[in-house]
Amino acid sequence: MLRAGVSTACLYPRVVEEALYDLALSGVSHVEIFINSHSELRRSFVDTLARLLQRFDMTCASLHPYTCEIEPNMLFSNYARRVDDYLEYCRYYFTAMQQLGAKVFVLHGNKVPAASVNKDMYFTRFRRLAELGESYGVQVTQENVARCTSASLPFLLEMRDALGKQARFVLDIKQAVRSGEDPFAMLRGLNSHIVHVHISDHGEYGDCLPLGKGRFRFDAFLKELAAVSPDCSVILELYRSGFSDVAELAANYTLLRNRIEGKR
């Protein structure tokens, strides 16, 4: 069954442990943790987060790395040694994910337009990272991001065909809208390869709104998602300017959870 959750990134720049605590006190039981600095990958710090999850009977679906902005330079440049270094660095993330019980690692990827990117290199580098993740019990996933190569659905379809089972995707609704892509078309194209979703609403008041504040047919979307990827986590990911306080964020999480469970 689909599972509703909230990203700690919604409360940025509140530090991650306080954001997680706020979500816990608000009744959120499933989260994505956004790591914002290297010190937050230290085993003792991650243990603090893990104890907090255990204390409130919460689960962590996924981890978002703070190094997403340097992925083009580290993972997809022509300087091969950087790739080796970045793969080694990702062991910090994957070890933290084991401590947290998280399975999904979110990758933004390169920023070269899809029309001019070296696709063979891209897919080979992604596969190397995916294989490393698998050795830790982690799924490395490609998120669609408007400013990145992954903005393009045709590129993601090529990635799916090239990588097969190792092609796993995070579908971000607001990023699809910003890219001029139809979220439903992305869902239907990538199908069961979608293992994680960042959800929000959109309409005339913005492209990253709380659910129910825009025109996104999220009930229909959730129904289609459940049919092709029933074990997916659906994570509410909003910007801090998009809601008034934690109570409003928690209420939107409850709305999402109820819709997934068929309640009104």
Q: Whereabouts are the PLM-identified features?
A:
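N-terminal pre-domain/capping segments
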Residues: 1-94, 98, 134, 168, ...
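Short acidic/polar active-site loop segments enriched in Thr and Asp
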Residues: 29, 103, 195, 232
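Conserved, mostly hydrophobic/aromatic
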Residues: 23, 31, 53, 97, ...
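Distinct, well-ordered alpha-helical segments
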Residues: 15-20, 46, 50, 116-124, ...
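Acidic/histidine-rich catalytic cores of soluble enzymes
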Residues: 30-31, 63, 128-215
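Active-site beta-loop-alpha junctions enriched in small/polar residues
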Residues: 7-11, 34-38, 65-68, 110-112, ...
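A short acidic, helix-capping loop that chelates divalent metal ions and anchors anionic groups
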Residues: 69-76, 111-117, 178-180, 204-209, ...
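Active-site acidic/histidine proton-transfer and metal-coordination neighborhood
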Residues: 17, 72-168
